[in-house]
UniProtKB/Swiss-Prot annotation:
InterPro entries: T-conotoxin. Contains 2 disulfide bonds that can be either 'C1-C3, C2-C4' or 'C1-C4, C2-C3', since these disulfide connectivities have been observed for conotoxins with cysteine framework V (for examples, see AC P0DQQ7 and AC P81755). Residues 20-50 form a propeptide. It comes from the Eukaryota. One of its GO terms (molecular function) is toxin activity. Keywords: Cleavage on pair of basic residues, Disulfide bond, Secreted, Signal, Toxin. Expressed by the venom duct. It comes from Conus miles. This is Conotoxin Mi5.2. Belongs to the conotoxin T superfamily. The cysteine framework is V (CC-CC). Coiled coil: none annotated. It is found in: Secreted.
Length: 62
C-alpha cells in the first residue's frame, strides 16, 4: 500500500515532463534564423544598388 501514492505521483509527473515538441518537422518548416537572414539579405540589396555610382557599373550588384 505504500507504493500506491508513489505510483500516483509518478503518473502525475510524467505528462508534465514532456516539454518537447512532438510534431515532426516537415519540409515546409523553416527555422527563424534563415528567415531573418533572408530578410537582411533582401533589405541589403536595395541599399547596395543605391550606393552605385552612375559612371561605374562594376560596383553595382555586389
Amino acid at each position: 500500500m505504500r507504493c500506491v501514492p508513489v505510483f500516483i505521483i509518478l503518473l502525475l509527473l510524467i505528462p508534465s515532463a514532456s516539454s518537447v515538441d512532438v510534431q515532426p518537422l516537415t519540409r515546409d518548416d523553416v527555422p527563424l534564423a534563415s528567415f531573418l537572414d533572408d530578410a537582411r539579405r533582401t533589405l541589403r540589396s536595395p541599399w547596395m544598388t543605391r550606393r552605385c555610382c552612375p559612371g561605374n557599373f562594376a560596383c553595382c550588384g555586389k
